[in-house]
Regions:
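Long helical/loop segments within the catalytic core of UDP-sugar-dependent glycosyltransferases
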Residues: 1-39, 43
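Catalytic donor/gating beta->alpha subdomain of glycosyltransferases that bind UDP-sugars
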Residues: 2-7, 42-112, 166-177
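N-terminal membrane-anchoring/stem segments of glycan-assembly enzymes
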Residues: 15, 153-155, 170, 174
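Low-complexity, charge- and small-residue-enriched intrinsically disordered regions
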Residues: 17-21, 176-193
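Short helix-capping/hinge motifs at transmembrane helix termini and TM-loop junctions
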Residues: 75, 157-159, 181
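Basic/Trp-rich segment in TM-proximal cytosolic loops or flexible interdomain/linker regions
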Residues: 77-147, 183-193
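Transmembrane alpha-helical segments that form the membrane-embedded catalytic/substrate-channel core
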Residues: 91, 125, 151-163
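Short amphipathic alpha-helical segments
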Residues: 113, 117, 146-151, 160-163, ...
Length: 193
């Protein structure tokens, strides 16, 4: 619930700013003429719904999450973490591919794309590097570093913070996995509501 609640708030905010570059395929509608204009769904990246919506938005249209639509998504019964890592892999592929199109984006869309690109490609590594530096400093006697690490660990009881940290871990793992497998196709998972 924590991730999905956060996800929905961000997608709606991006939609109000201009367009959202991230979709979950359980409920997405595309105008056929626009699908044809962008060449349909890409087969080279896993987040085909998100990438197609972004390519449409780059042509001056909008890709939005609707605040009054209701959709129930089934989640995997087993392999939930693998599912989250795969989804993270696909979004990393999407934003890495979208980087070269940033100059074509309108200012509203460019802002959204820059923030999401930073959050998916760079932010997880900033956290990993900062944590590594703090660990080193704490081991070598820095009371400030130790205090920050204890504070960060204690904050894990706060659900939004825990959700953010977990998401950063999925993104780091996904980036590493993308080095040897892009996992464009995968087996169907049994899902529960």
């Amino acid at each position: 619930e924590g991730y999905r609640e956060f996800y929905n708030v961000v997608r709606l905010a991006e939609s109000k700013a201009h367009s959202t570059p991230i979709f979950h395929g359980e409920l997405a509608a595309f105008r056929r003429s626009l699908l044809n204009e962008v060449g349909g769904f890409p087969t080279s990246i896993g987040a085909d719904d998100s990438h197609t919506a972004t390519m449409i938005a780059l042509r001056g249209y909008r890709s939005i999450a609707v605040d009054n639509a209701w959709c129930v998504e089934s989640v995997p019964r087993g392999g939930y973490h693998k599912w989250r890592v795969r989804r993270a892999q696909h979004l990393i592929q999407h934003f890495a591919t979208t980087l070269r199109h940033l100059t074509k984006a309108s200012s509203g869309l460019r802002g959204v794309l820059l923030v999401e690109t930073h959050l998916h490609l760079f932010n997880p590594w900033i956290l990993a590097v900062a944590t590594t530096i703090l660990l080193y400093l704490a081991i070598t006697g820095s009371l400030t570093a130790l205090t920050l690490l204890v504070l960060g660990t204690t904050l894990l009881v706060y659900r939004p913070y825990r959700t953010w940290i977990t998401t950063q871990l999925y993104l780091v793992i996904a980036t590493i996995r993308n080095l040897w497998t892009r996992e464009i196709a995968w087996g169907k998972q049994a899902k529960a509501r």
